[in-house]
Amino acid sequence: MRPRCCILALVCWITVFLLQCSKGTTDAPVGSGLWLCQPTPRCGNKIYNPSEQCCYDDAILSLKETRRCGSTCTFWPCFELCCPESFGPQQKFLVKLRVLGMKSQCHLSPISRSCTRNRRHVLYP
C-alpha cells in the first residue's frame, strides 16, 4: 500500500507542476478589440502622431513649425520654450530647451539662447 501512496503523491505533484508551468498562457488578455502597448498621445481630446506632430497650448503643431519669441527671435514650440527674462519697456526673452518626458517649465529648463535685440545701423546710399 505504501508504494501506491507514493505513486499517487508523485502523480499529484507532477500535475500541479505542469499546471503551474502552463499558467502563463492562461493569463493572456481576452477580447476582440484592439490591444495597444502604449497609450495614444492626446492633445486635449484629439489624437496626434508624436513622430510628426506635438501638442502646444492644446493645439496640434507640425514638428517643423516655428513661432515668434519676443520681437527678435523665432523658436520651435515642439522642442523649445519662449521664456520672458524681464518685464518692462525693454523686455528680454530666453529660448530654453524642452525637457522630454516632463511638462517643461521656464524656471527648470536649460537655456538654449538669448533673444536680445541686435541694434544694426543700416546705412542707406
UniProtKB/Swiss-Prot annotation:
This one is known as Insulin growth factor-like family member 3
The organism's taxonomic lineage, starting at the top: Eukaryota, Metazoa, Chordata, Craniata, Vertebrata
Specify the domain of life of the species encoding this protein.
Answer: Eukaryota
Provenance organism: Homo sapiens
- Per the record's keyword annotation, is Secreted included, yes or no? yes
This entry's Gene Ontology molecular function terms read: signaling receptor binding
Cystine connections? none
Q: What does this protein do?
A: Potential ligand of the IGFLR1 cell membrane receptor.
Where is the signal peptide, in residue numbers?
A: 1-24
* Record keywords, A-Z: Secreted, Signal
Q: Where found?
A: Secreted
Output a single Gene Ontology CC term carried by this record.
Answer: extracellular space
- Chief location bin: secreted
* Tissue expression remark: Detected in the cerebellum.
The family note in this entry says: Belongs to the IGFL family.
